[in-house]
Amino acid sequence: FALAHMVNDFDILKSYLDEGANGVETDITFSDEGEPEYAFHGVPCDCKRWCRRTVGFNEYLQHVRDLSTPGNPKFREHFIAIVLDLKLNGLSQEALAHGGMRLADKLIAYYWAHGRNATRITFIVSVPKTSEKVFLKTFLEEIKAVGYDDMLSKVAFDFTDNGDFSETQKVFEGLGIHEHIWASDGITNCIPMLFRGTSRLEDLIRQRDVPGYKYISKVYAWTYDKETSVVKALELGVDGVMTNYADFVIGIINKPEHSSKYRLATYQDNPFEKFVKSA
């Protein structure tokens, strides 16, 4: 997966899809009460990016529904994944609980309700911290309560706090989430990978590849903009790279030394199937 980073309005979405990205990451902001309101990041953000692009969340979902529905004039065949980077910092537990329910409601009303079996996006619901787990609890409860639990086949889950994954697994177990987990590791592109290192990323990949282990389906790295970082991630065996330069990452994947081992995922590929790195 070549995941375009910080895609918060329609112009930049078009630009990244034109570059060939098969997935995007979008930042979702919430009111103090927990209502999902906008695709928006704000300052500070990644280096060499404009931080203030924005669009209403309802409009965003309607637009990506058009882009991901076969037969729609706007359909983009290669567009198959969206990481919803949920900006939950500062919300009370009550607001987090409301937010999870309302995110489910909005996905149903503005994305799935007009063709639940026709649309193609897998949503990765990305929560910043395990202490915000009640958000996922109410998200799941609401989807099941209104009879859309079949659409959980198109949903993955992630905590992005870069914590000890053995502890993260316990949180997933407590939530009753035993599959469809996309684990991630990363930091802003303003800090070189050299300073962060790849030890945690390597640990996630090793854990993913343990036979019979089900709590990691995919591993992606963020936010990689340099060739050395992207090549290192591919060599380690990641399933996805989040980047500010999708065409650059795709170009690296298509180089002869990588194209024999990697290709961009398509809709025909299972977003929860493990592709274990061979020895």
From Swiss-Prot:
Keywords of the record: Cytolysis, Dermonecrotic toxin, Disulfide bond, Hemolysis, Lipid degradation, Lipid metabolism, Lyase, Magnesium, Metal-binding, Secreted, Toxin
EC code(s) of this entry: 4.6.1.-
Cofactor: how bound: Binds 1 Mg(2+) ion per subunit.
Reactions catalysed, as given in the entry: an N-(acyl)-sphingosylphosphocholine = an N-(acyl)-sphingosyl-1,3-cyclic phosphate + choline; an N-(acyl)-sphingosylphosphoethanolamine = an N-(acyl)-sphingosyl-1,3-cyclic phosphate + ethanolamine; a 1-acyl-sn-glycero-3-phosphocholine = a 1-acyl-sn-glycero-2,3-cyclic phosphate + choline; a 1-acyl-sn-glycero-3-phosphoethanolamine = a 1-acyl-sn-glycero-2,3-cyclic phosphate + ethanolamine
GO biological process: killing of cells of another organism; lipid catabolic process
SS bonds (residue pairs): C45-C51, C47-C190
Positions annotated as active site in the UniProt record: H5, H41
Protein name: Dermonecrotic toxin LspiSicTox-betaIE3i
InterPro entries for the chain: PLC-like_Pdiesterase_TIM-brl
Primary location group: secreted
